[in-house]
Amino acid sequence: MGGLFSRWRTKLSTVEVLESIDKEIQALEEFREKNQRLQKLRVGRLILYSSVLYLFTCLIVYLWYLPDEFTARLAMTLPFFAFPLIIWSIRTVIIFFFSKRTERNNEALDDLKSQRKKILEEVMEKETYKTAKLILERFDPDSKKAKECEPPSAGGAVTARPGQEIRQRTAAQRNLSPTPASPNQGPPPQVPVSPGPPKDSSAPGGPPERTVTPALSSNVLPRHLGSPATSVPGMGLHPPGPPLARPILPRERGALDRIVEYLVGDGPQNRYALICQQCFSHNGMALKEEFEYIAFRCAYCFFLNPARKTRPQAPRLPEFSFEKRQVVEGSSSVGPLPSGSVLSSDNQFNEESLEQDVLDNNTEQTDDKIPATEQTNQVIEKASDSEEPEEKQETENEEASVIETNSTVPGADSIPDPELNGESLTAE
């Protein structure tokens, strides 16, 4: 009879079996969490109540029931030493009891999970693709986790991360592959191509994106900033863009950053944005002092933006010669020389100048009748004309002193120079 009734019983489907297993797994997981909470609660209450009871009993015994004899006191304090050990043993028993329950629960949970895994493997082998996909998405925990951790779609909005300095623009991928045309349909309409320059399509706030013809844009990939440029048919390789002229300050700043900006006088409110003149892109923020005089190259379109103003330059200082200054100071510090020293130095200078004039002017004839005093005066005048303007006054003073000495000592200048006379005769 049992076999007959067993034939009439309907067999549970795979979905129903998985649902029952899933319910049992959830019940066991809830029981495990409840068991852990109950264990912590029981152990905590045991320690709390036993501690309060222990302190209260010690206080009562010490105030009212403490005997005077030493042996009686020792016998009275023995239970107080044994009480903490008893409480500790009770706590150990409670933890052991709950741990055993947790182990049994975990074993049952592992068995149910293994059964579910076997059933899912059978589903993947026996059921159709659509049914197996639905069952796996509903009961397989691995597929659930993978679905939850799936990254957002490329078409969704991309949120900017805090502290991101350079905006990365991603071009939208366009499917430009033509649809297969039916035989009844005519050829696709020809789109006239204008001979003018191609228009630039740009996103708001970003650089213009160059449009590419359908024949060339089928293999175009979006190029991120800071990465090596990708080769595009018909277009050359572009080097990676230059860095920003000035960094872009992050929007989210902490309290410490705001305090430092307030003390230093720096921050977004004290800076000016560097906007490219060609693509109107943001290239960082410059200080007020350097905004008018800074020139930068755009990090997106490589356009060189000149400075608005030229920085004023200070006038060039005259060159300073330390040796010349020493000569001037030495000449000003030297006082009038004595008559004897002036005479000797003047005679030596006259002799040297006369010899130089004779050697340079060999073709000229010299007059023997001219006295030696006049010749020395002429040489002194020539030498004074070639000296610097600062020493003119000093030479005049020396000439006056020489004239005075000549008047007092007639024999020194009236004696003719035999060498000079001989040279003049030979020249004649």
Swiss-Prot record:
The modification Phosphoserine is found at residues 114, 153, 177, 182, 194, 217, 227, 321, 353, 384, 414. Residues 67-77 are lumenal. One of its GO terms (cellular component) is endoplasmic reticulum membrane. GO terms for molecular function: identical protein binding; zinc ion binding. Keywords: Coiled coil, Developmental protein, Endoplasmic reticulum, Lipoprotein, Membrane, Metal-binding, Myristate, Phosphoprotein, Transmembrane, Transmembrane helix, Zinc, Zinc-finger. Its main location: endoplasmic reticulum. One of its GO terms (biological process) is positive regulation of endoplasmic reticulum tubular network organization. Residues 2-45, 99-428 are cytoplasmic. Myristoylated; myristoylation is necessary for the endoplasmic reticulum (ER) three-way ER tubular junction formation, but is not required neither for membrane translocation, membrane topology formation, nor for the specific localization to ER membranes. The chain crosses the membrane at residues 46-66, 78-98. It is found in: Endoplasmic reticulum membrane. Residues 386-401 have a biased composition (Acidic residues). It comes from the Eukaryota. The modification Phosphothreonine is found at residues 211, 213. Residues 185-198 have a biased composition (Pro residues). It holds the Pfam family Zn_ribbon_10. Residues 143-248, 361-428 are annotated as: Disordered. The transmembrane domain 1 and 2 function as a signal-anchor and stop-transfer sequence, respectively, generating a double-spanning integral membrane protein with a N- and C-terminal cytoplasmic orientation. Transmembrane domain 1 and 2 are probably sufficient to mediate membrane translocation and topology formation in a N-myristoylation-independent manner. Transmembrane domain 2 is sufficient to block the protein secretion pathway. The two coiled-coil domains are necessary for its endoplasmic reticulum (ER) three-way tubular junction localization. Belongs to the lunapark family. This is Endoplasmic reticulum junction formation protein lunapark. The gene is LNPK.
